[in-house]
Design a protein with these regions (language model features):
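Conserved Walker
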Residues: 2-18, 30-36, 74-78, 109-110
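Alpha-helical lid/collar subdomain of P-loop NTPases
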Residues: 18-23, 27, 42-45, 52-232
């Protein structure tokens, strides 16, 4: 950038670059991220973006979940749609706790323990994969929410201790925010939702053609294992 170009590695010739604008984004140098030198930063106009507050996050993801409910082919029971605000609040709360808990802070050995809004949005992206046939009660919807949170946050954790810490966070939140006992809600652990086993879809419908896109809980692990071997 100082000299207006760079050398070609193959021909060793200097290539002049003209009419180029550099746009970059970065986070503060913590959690394994390197410091960017002032010598390099002097080429840029720095713009700092304040993090979204919880009220803004609630509005953003609340609208996404509301859009999802409205655009389903068939209306869901009120007992499920009434969970919207609590689901959004709980997801933001869990995201904040995972980010700030000293037990899950990034270290040199766990430098990937970094979460951002992209991870938060993926929870809702997973929820919106479900269809009317994915759940028939609010308990099914809560299990879907817990599954998506586990896939986004827990799957990144590399030690049993860290995974147990997250499990306790999720169970406590389920009891406090939704008044559900985890052991009574989840009969088969770990939670597993997918859309690749048509014989396990709701209503015992074995028509892969009709319901090949149903994203639902898979409780028969032997059938899951058998289907995975078939795909191999």
């Amino acid at each position: 950038m100082d000299h207006g170009g760079w050398y070609d590695l193959d021909t060793k010739e200097f290539k002049n670059l003209c009419g180029i604008n550099f746009v970059a984004a970065m986070l503060p140098p913590t959690g394994g991220r390197n410091v960017v030198t002032m010598r390099y930063l002097r080429h840029f106009n720095l713009i700092y973006v304040e993090p979204f507050d919880n009220e803004s996050l609630f509005k953003i993801f609340g609208n996404i979940l509301e859009w999802y409910f409205i655009n389903l082919p068939q209306s869901l029971p009120k007992s499920i749609t009434n969970l919207k605000d609590n689901i959004v609040h709980s997801t933001i709360e869990l995201y904040t706790k995972v980010q700030t808990s000293k037990e899950l802070l990034p270290t040199p050995a766990k430098s990937h323990y970094i979460y951002n809004l992209r991870d938060l949005s993926k929870v809702f992206q997973g929820i919106t994969k479900a269809s009317n046939r994915s759940f028939v009660s609010e308990n099914d919807f809560l299990k879907l929410w817990a599954h998506e949170c586990s896939r986004i946050f827990k799957d990144r954790l590399i030690s049993i201790q860290d995974q147990n810490f997250f499990d306790n966070l999720l169970k406590d939140m389920m009891k406090t925010n939704f008044k559900r006992d985890w052991e009574g809600l989840v009969t088969v652990e770990p939670l597993l939702w997918a859309s690749f086993i048509p014989t396990l879809y709701p209503d015992n419908d074995k028509s892969k053609k009709a319901y090949s896109d149903v994203y639902c809980e898979l409780t028969d692990r032997e059938a899951v294992k058998k289907k995975c071997y078939q795909y191999l």
